[in-house]
Amino acid sequence: MSLVGGFPHHPVMHHDGYSFAAAAAASRCHEEPPYFHGWLISHPEMSPPDYTMAPSYSPEYSTGAPGLDHSHYGGVPGAGAVGMGPRTVKRRPTANRKERRRTQSINSAFAELRECIPNVPADTKLSKIKTLRLATSYIAYLMDILDKDEQNGETEAFKAEFKKTDAKEERRKKEMNDVLKSSGSSNDKKTKGRTGWPQHVWALELKQ
């Protein structure tokens, strides 16, 4: 009991209170944020002034929220996209295959047509338009010979009805008719089998 106030006096435990405060402070010092501690370990090359510029720890980056990009924190880009399967590539329709078949069919038809034209030089490469022109000229030549045979050797040549085109085409047809007339008058014998085509006709056609 205290002699001053007459009340019982409880001694103050200064030593124990100081120990409790020191323990609490020590525990707070040891409880460092795990992100800051890991950041210090992973960035040893940074100087102390740069520590204040480091990004603060935010819980939203550790919750794995969707739509967040973690690539600037060392994460794998695109890791947040879940359920994304391989992209399916749609195949194009079979139009390309049909086009290749059509082209092959046309080329085969032109190759067969070139074989039907006689006296073609071996080193001569004919285009499609040249093949068609030579084929029509050869057909006109054969029809002219057949027509002259029916007319008992008359020299009048067969004239096919063509639409009028430009002056160059008309001149070519006129020259062809003149060549056919001259070749028919010089050769009176009736040929047997496949009829040949005179070489000067080839020379005239290749000049075009």
UniProtKB/Swiss-Prot annotation:
Residues 88-103 have a biased composition (Basic residues). Keywords: Developmental protein, DNA-binding, Nucleus, Transcription, Transcription regulation. SMART domains: HLH (SM00353). Residues 161-178 have a biased composition (Basic and acidic residues). The keyword DNA-binding applies. It is found in: Nucleus. This is Heart- and neural crest derivatives-expressed protein 2. Residues 79-106, 161-197 are annotated as: Disordered. InterPro entries: bHLH_dom, E-box_TF_Regulators, HLH_DNA-bd_sf.
